[in-house]
Design a protein with these regions (language model features):
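Acidic-and-aromatic substrate-binding clefts and catalytic sites of carbohydrate-active enzymes
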Residues: 47-52, 71-81, 100-107, 131-134, ...
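Acidic/histidine-rich catalytic cores of soluble enzymes
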Residues: 156-244
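Short, acidic/polar
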Residues: 49-60, 105-114, 206-210
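Catalytic domains of carbohydrate-active enzymes, especially glycoside hydrolases
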Residues: 57-74, 119
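Conserved, mostly hydrophobic/aromatic
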Residues: 41, 61, 87, 115, ...
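N-terminal secretory signal peptides and thylakoid transit peptides that target proteins
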Residues: 1-19, 25
Length: 293
């Protein structure tokens, strides 16, 4: 998700249906089903705007038709009480919260306060920065223990704990594993995954295959678009549907396992509200997700 703290990986290609979907205009990939995932927005996308004009910025998001939002650590001038009231007044459901850091120690109390204020039962550790948590197999095993203990703590509080990826979670380690696949196999099944499809593609992987492999363990997907090239180029992001991402294939791969498609921009050099508006319209027009409008 983040380029820096708070200003802030190809497997075999998916064949057939995904490619066919891209060849046909306005193809509703859920045409034979009443089900569609909901469209949400990761608030980090509008971090600069909400710091200076919170209420009107959130109204713009709601007016596009977004069902809900995923929070991050909000600017200091926006209290939990203020944020919660604005979200409620605008009918924006807080379906997920990104933790400021791995929610252990004192960070747990902050996470519980967020959950109470937002009436939200899904907490995601965004995984930033890369650091050494997956560097060696011993580190990985220790990290698994920490994640499992964290998930158990929050489960007792009625909160689901999940993990978010950047590119390194889908790059092979020196000891021969892909971190997120290792975690999927070794973590308690209560831990869910939020797959950032763009960073998976940027890592050189097929995000549709990843989404299929993770199945019900990945109910939330981050949806963003761009060149998906490692380095600074990765941050030259564009509205959903205007880059290299194959979202129909991703939607087919996840099917009804996907609960939320979460639009996100790490960076955008044009008007961010135009970007999130175009992204919303693309998902609606192509029948990939459901919105209010």
């Amino acid at each position: 998700m983040k380029k820096n703290a708070y200003s802030r990986k190809d497997f075999l290609k998916l064949m057939g249906l995904g490619a066919a979907a891209m060849a046909l205009p306005n193809l509703d990939v859920f045409a034979n089903s009443k089900y569609k995932p909901k469209i949400g927005l990761q608030l980090y996308s509008v971090r600069r705007q909400i710091e200076h004009d919170f209420e009107s910025s959130m109204k713009k998001v709601a007016d596009f038709g977004y069902f809900g939002i995923e929070t991050y650590t909000l600017p200091a001038n926006i209290t939990l009480e203020r944020a919660s009231k604005v979200f409620n007044d605008l009918g924006l459901k807080v379906f997920s919260m990104h933790a400021a850091d791995l929610p252990i120690g004192d960070f747990r109390e902050a996470a519980l306060k967020m959950a109470d204020a937002y009436k939200c039962d899904h907490l995601v550790y965004p995984g930033w920065p890369q650091n050494d948590k997956y560097k060696t197999l011993d580190n990985m095993k220790h990290t698994v223990d920490i994640y499992d203990e964290t998930a158990e703590f929050f489960k007792k509080k009625g909160i689901h704990f999940g993990l978010h990826n950047h590119w390194w979670e889908f790059q092979k380690t020196t000891y021969g594993v892909f971190p997120f696949y290792y975690l999927k196999e070794h973590l308690n099944k209560d831990v869910f995954f939020e797959i950032d499809t763009y960073w998976a593609k940027t890592a050189g992987q097929n995000p549709a295959k990843i989404v299929k492999d993770f199945g019900k363990r990945a109910p939330f997907l981050h949806i963003k678009d761009g060149p998906a090239i490692m380095g600074d180029e990765a941050y030259k992001q564009v509205p959903v549907g205007e880059g290299v991402m194959d979202f129909p294939a991703i939607a087919h791969a996840g099917g009804s396992n996907i609960k939320w498609m979460i639009v996100e921009f790490d960076e955008y050099d044009k008007n961010i509200f135009d970007g999130i508006g175009k992204s919303y319209k693309y998902l609606i027009k192509n029948g990939l997700a459901e919105g209010k409008v």
